[in-house]
Amino acid sequence: MHCPFCSENDTKVIDSRLVADGHQVRRRRQCLACNERFTTFETAELLMPKVIKSNGNREPFNEDKMVGGIQRALEKRPVSADAIELAISMIKSKLRATGEREVPSKMIGNLVMEQLKHLDKVAYIRFASVYRSFEDIREFGEEIARLED
C-alpha cells in the first residue's frame, strides 16, 4: 500500500482488528520510508444481483432507490435511523444470500414489505398501497385486515 504522506510503496501493518461487527478490518500501518502512521479499513466487496424489472429489462441493483422508497414510507413515523439501517442491511443480506446473479424486482418489493411490517404497520400500508397499486379504499381495508390476522 502506498504511503499517503510520501507515496512510498513500503508499509508494514502494526495492528489489525475487526470493527463494524466483524464486517470490516481496521489496520494501523507505518511507512518504512518516512515512519508516518496511518489507518486503513478493509471490507469484502459483495456484489448485489441485477434486478429483473416487471417489463423484462435488467438493471443494476440501486440501493438508493430502495432506501428512498423505505424512507418515504417511514416519513414522520417513530422509527429510529438504526432500525432503518438494520432493515436495509437485512434486505441486502437476503438478496446476496439467494446466490442468484439476477432477482426479480418483485422479490425486492416483498423483502421491503416484510421488513416494514416489522418496523411500522402504517409504513407497511403506505408502501403496499404504492407497490401493489391500490385502486380504492376497499383494497386498503383488505390489506389492513390481512395485517391484523
From Swiss-Prot:
Cofactor(s) in the UniProt record: Zn(2+)
Domain ATP-cone per the UniProt entry, residue ranges: 49-139
Keyword Transcription: yes
GO biological process terms, semicolon-separated: negative regulation of DNA-templated transcription
Stretches annotated zinc finger (unnamed): 3-34
Cofactor remark from the record: Binds 1 zinc ion.
Listed Pfam families: ATP-cone, Zn_ribbon_NrdR
Record-level Gene Ontology MF annotations: ATP binding; DNA binding; zinc ion binding
Highest rank taxon of the organism: Bacteria
Keywords: ATP-binding, DNA-binding, Metal-binding, Nucleotide-binding, Repressor, Transcription, Transcription regulation, Zinc, Zinc-finger
Family per record: Belongs to the NrdR family.
Free-text function comment from the UniProt entry: Negatively regulates transcription of bacterial ribonucleotide reductase nrd genes and operons by binding to NrdR-boxes.
Protein name as annotated: Transcriptional repressor NrdR
Organism (species): Vibrio vulnificus (strain YJ016)
